[in-house]
Amino acid sequence: MSDPVFIAPKGGLTLGSVAEACGVPLPDGADPSQPVTGAAPLETAGPSELAYMDNARYGDALATTRALACLVSPRFAPRVPAGTIALVTRDPYRAYAGLLARLYEEAMRPGSLFAAAGVSPGAHVHPQARLEDGVRIDPGAVVGPGAEIGAGTVLGPNAVIGPNVRIGRDCSIGAGTTLTHALVGNRVIVHPGARIGQDGFGFAMGAGGHIKVPQVGRVIIQDDVEIGANTTIDRGASRDTVVGEGTKIDNLVQIAHNVVIGRHCVIVSGVGISGSTTLEDYVVLGGQVGVVGHLRIGMGSQIAGSSNVNRDVPPGSRWGGTPAKPVRTWFREMTTLARLAERSGKDEAEG
């Protein structure tokens, strides 16, 4: 039995069309009509495939690659072997990503299990819901009353869209997701199992018991956002939870009520953001970062993985540690502690 190919490369691409798409000039003597059948790592790329290289650690792999062509920075271009065409660009990885998007269009967003547009048997769409042309709804999906779904959007199996939810055009809503109390922009990707719009965790604490605070806000997800599998985004308590345009959120992230995330932020898996915190544009949170509530993380700041942020972060900062602080301070503290521990160990041995 042969191994299945889950995502096949698009046919009809040539070296010339690929170079043009990547904005890279072909070197003299290269044949632009040569077919390109795929992309692969340096070690496994064959004579009709492309690879990329932008890290000195892979110098040996570059020297022995059999790839038809390799996207490289000017620094590594002289090391491309004679049998491989050097496609020189300042940002090989970004160019490679653009190439992959052309070769593997199916991998760019989750698709329908059923190729035809329309409502599949076994799906349940309320008569008061409104679907634009070209919407695809897989079996088991539920669309509530008053919901509106834009053209080209796909709902995976068992996805649940609550009453009055708005979903824009060309979105992909993965299998088993729930979307309630939410307004979703265009070209948004939500991976399987995500939960968006459920109650925020709000209680008035007291000795006589904890009184639930009604959560009456919404979730606003702007255009071109991607949300990973099993991520949870709570709706606002009295104002909206917002995820800004172009932000990318990994799997297993928790975003609490009233959080506002700016444009083009990157949030890696395992992050927890407590209520009413604001991330300005282009913030990056590494894996397993914890952010306490009611803070502001300034534009362009980067927080190292496994850090705990318990105070405001100025714009353009690089912080890490628990509690988080500027990375230079954090590194100095870690170095000092290591030296103290080493010295203490020597003293004990001598004693």
From Swiss-Prot:
Q: Where is the active site?
A: H257 (proton acceptor)
The keyword Transferase is assigned to this record:
yes
Does the record carry Transcription regulation as a key word? Answer: no
The record's annotation in InterPro entries points to: Hexapep (IPR001451), Hexapep_transf_CS (IPR018357), LpxD (IPR007691), Trimer_LpxA-like_sf (IPR011004), UDP_GlcNAc_AcTrfase_non-rep (IPR020573)
Entry-linked Pfam families: Hexapep (PF00132), LpxD (PF04613)
Biological or metabolic pathway of the protein: Bacterial outer membrane biogenesis; LPS lipid A biosynthesis
What are the annotated GO cellular component locations? Answer: membrane
* Family assignment from sequence similarity: Belongs to the transferase hexapeptide repeat family. LpxD subfamily.
Instruction: Report the protein name in the record.
Output: UDP-3-O-acylglucosamine N-acyltransferase
Tell me the classification of the organism that encodes this protein: Bacteria, Pseudomonadati, Pseudomonadota, Alphaproteobacteria, Hyphomicrobiales
